[in-house]
Each structure stands twice: as C-alpha cells, then as structure tokens.
Amino acid sequence: MTTRLADIAAQAGVSEATVSRVLNGKPGVAATTRQSVLAALDVLGYERPVRLRQRSEGLVGLITPELENPIFPALAQVIGQALTRQGYTPVLATQTPGGSTEDELTEMLVDRGVAGIIYVSGLHADTTADMQRYERLRAQGVPFVLVDGFSSQVQAPFISPDDRAAMSLAVTHLVSLGHTRIGLALGPKRFVPVQRKIEGFVRTVQDQLGLSAETVEKELVQHSLYTLEGGQAAASALIGRDCTAVVCASDMMALGAIRAARQLGLDVPKDVSVVGFDDSPLIAFTDPPLTTVRKPVPAMGQAAVRTLLEEIGGTPAPHSEFVFMPELVVRGSTASAPGERGRP
C-alpha cells in the first residue's frame, strides 16, 4: 500500500497524506487536488475505491462517420473526455459503409434514453438531405448539437471551423512561396464544408492571383472522395493541369496527393507543394512532414459538450453557428515554386 501511495502521490504531485485523505473520503482536500489524485489513479491503472466512483449523470450519444480518418477519433476523444469530466457517459456510435445509418443510430440512442446527442459531420452537412429528421428529434425532446456543417432549416447549435479562412491561409502561404498555379482537391460538392472551402479558395485566388472565378472553378478545383485514393486521383488531375501546389480538404487526401506526385516522378516539395487540412494525430511524422491547416479540435469538442449541457440543463445557447478559427502549420511539404528557386 505504501508503494502505491508513493506512486500516486508522485503522479499527482501531492503528498502521500493527501492521497490517503482522498482515498478514504476525508474532508479538507481541495476539489482540484482531489481530481488530480483521481486522475493519477486512472493513469497508473489502479481501480478507484467504490466510494470514489462517479455516478453517471446519464448517457450522451456521439455519432461520427467512419473512424479511418484520424481526425474523427481525435474529436471523439476530446468530446468523450469533456463529457466524462462533467459526469456523463459517452456512447460512441459509428457509421460504416453498409452498416447502420445515422437515423438508425439515432433511434438506438433515443431508445436507450440518452440525455442528448452530438452529431459530427452528419447529414446536417449534406445539402441534399432531409433536415426534417432533426426537427422530429427536437419534437421528441432530445437535445442535440451539430458539428461540422450548417443548415438554416435546423433550429440547433452548430459548431464549425472557418472553412473559408482555412483556404485563405493555405493559398496565401503558397502565393508567398511564388506559386501561381494552385489546385484544390476536395470532396463532393453537396457538402456544406466543401462549398465553403471552394468559396474561400476562389475568393483568395481571385484577390491574390487575379484569376476569374470561372477559371478557378473550372481548372483548379477537383472533386473526389475524402480518402487517400481520392486525394491521389484529384491531385493527379490537378498536376496534369500544370499545378505546382495542391491544397487538400483533409490530411488523408494530402497523403494521397504526395503519392500521386511521386508516382509521376515528382518530388514533394521540390516539384509540387502539398497542403492538408485537419492536422490529424501523427501527421507531423509523415515523409515529408505535412504542412496543413489545423482544425481547432479541442476548442470545437469542448464547445460542443458545453453547448449540449446547456441544452440539457434547460438554458440553451442561441440556435446559431459557433465558428472557430483554424491555424496554418508550416512543415516540410511546401517550398518555393520551381521557377522561383535561385532567384535573388
């Protein structure tokens, strides 16, 4: 027991006497200190005493797309941790091709009496989807928050990154490196984040390179799938149109763009620069390390939980969109345009 107390005390940064008071449920310990000791127990793999186990305030559903794209597990982790800190138990429900649909997962969660639901990149982001499903859910009295996507037809809080600003950051960076032929690889046009990225990309290219909107959309925008293979196909088409830089709507697509360049005998970033979007876990360790636009995942995840808990508590936030600014992270996949090298 003494060894265990010492381990926990060292991990939590407190005395063994304080650990003992927490484990025995004694008063006189600050809430933050108590939480540090409990966190140390969890990190070290010790089981919490029965008296210290939190009683769940209820279940909260989290519906995400497939988890192959690492940004979705990252967001799920932030949301799950934030819910747990507030005493709720997260229930992760994942959509997979050929598996359960969003509507089926929603019905399952409602049947289990969840206190609320957070949707990530769901049908609310698809402009062709029927938004009445969300109004029916509201009529059932189930609070919900929608992440990544927006529809004026749905009365609910939305949490989004600023997709237009993300494209402005990427294009401005590439123009500063001397690139004048910049392509955009992204998903199907029916999705709201895709439409917003196109708007930001077209506007910035117009402003900084003087191209017409028609030329940009016709020659420099390539739709594909949000996968490595989709990025590879889109980038191949854009490089074939003499693009020396490609901005991708996800890091997975960007990895596909790098593969496309290499298969064409080109070097990244010497011959082609590539910019991703998300800053997914481990993306800094690719070859080359990927320049990307970082989605503010921690802030978005925490805001989604805070907003949902306000809905659950009966003091709902405004039914509008909360937009979070992205950040450009420059690494090794972007460099000066080929024709710019060696100039004084």
Swiss-Prot record:
One of its GO terms (biological process) is regulation of DNA-templated transcription. The keyword ATP-binding does not apply. Residues 5-24 bind DNA. Gene3D superfamilies: 3.40.50.2300, lambda repressor-like DNA-binding domains. The keyword Kinase does not apply. Keywords: DNA-binding, Repressor, Transcription, Transcription regulation. GO terms for molecular function: DNA-binding transcription factor activity; transcription cis-regulatory region binding. PROSITE patterns: HTH_LACI_1, HTH_LACI_2. It comes from the Bacteria. Residues 1-54 form the HTH lacI-type domain. Transcriptional repressor of the maltosaccharide utilization operon malEFG. This is HTH-type transcriptional regulator MalR. The gene is malR.
